Amino acid sequence: MADLKAHIAKVASGAALSFAEAREAFGIIMSGEATPSQIGGFLMALRVRGETVDEISGAVDTMRSKMLPVTAPAEAVDIVGTGGDASGTYNVSTCAAFIVAGCGVPVAKHGNRALSSKSGAADSLVALGVNIELGPDQIAACIAEAGVGFMFAPSHHAAMRHVGPTRVELGTRTIFNLLGPLSNPAGVKRQLVGVFSAQWVEPLAHVLRQLGTEKAWVVHGDGLDEMTTAGVTRVASLEYGEVRTFEITPEEVGLQRSAAAALKGGDGEYNGKALRRVLEGERNAYRDIAVLNAGGALIVAGKAETLKDAVALASESIESGRALAALEKLVEVSNRKP
């Protein structure tokens, strides 16, 4: 049986693991061959030294190899955040997913229940009447008919059960906070990924490049794991092997700057209602941040050349009723008897 001890010793010495070594180490962990103490020691050694692009890439490669896959169109996108930003915003990326679907771009949304906040994507979707306990064929049907399907992370990443208790006991962020958003079960090649800290914006774009992603924006918005209307958003854009970084303000795309407090959400019930009101056409700070993030995803999807044009497309998706129709269709299809 492979042993994690050699990898722990290497990381503890300050050295970095290669892609292959990281892949092996996480293979040991996700196969249940490491003890909780070994897993905890390994994760904290990585965290203290700082995870490298190769280590994250190797870990994601292992996670992808063990996941339950979903079939989605080649042009499908995901809009996902790492969580863990402690901001308590409403479910921006979930709202943006319906807006993007309303623009005719298939969305394969990967997410979970709340881990550190009051409400994760799954919590607000359940409050809206979406059935999240679906098999791969049912999710594929949701994407085909509603333009959006939701993949509930625990249903697709059973190997994570080996690390769950250790992560809870550690009570602090680890490399696993970065792996989930990069391990989409539909294997999407285009993503808008929000990260909890600006330090990860550029490295994660390089991880996605190493793993074969075609186009992605990795973003951090002034403390949020998404693009923000309350300040400046840092972006690392990956396009066919090239990574470049830049900053975005809401004003430059025609949106008003919001107070950070205006973006705060609540529990799943509250966030679900807030999301529906945005899709029904209510104009507020929730809408502005949703169309900004939808705009980023539409750029990644190749639907617009400029973010200003993409934001206009996103607004039109709401005003035409198509974004709300995508939500209502998802509720219908997800609850259909298989």
From Swiss-Prot:
Binding site for 5-phospho-alpha-D-ribose 1-diphosphate: 81, 84-85, 89, 91-94, 109-117, 121
Residues holding Mg(2+) 2: D225, E226
Record has Transferase as a keyword: yes
The protein's annotated pathway: Amino-acid biosynthesis; L-tryptophan biosynthesis; L-tryptophan from chorismate: step 2/5
Domain of life: Bacteria
Functional description taken from the UniProt entry: Catalyzes the transfer of the phosphoribosyl group of 5-phosphorylribose-1-pyrophosphate (PRPP) to anthranilate to yield N-(5'-phosphoribosyl)-anthranilate (PRA).
Protein's UniProt name: Anthranilate phosphoribosyltransferase
Gene source species: Chelativorans sp. (strain BNC1)
Cofactor: Mg(2+)
Free-text remark on how the cofactor is bound: Binds 2 magnesium ions per monomer.
Binding site for Mg(2+) 1: S93, E226
Cellular-component GO terms for this entry: cytosol
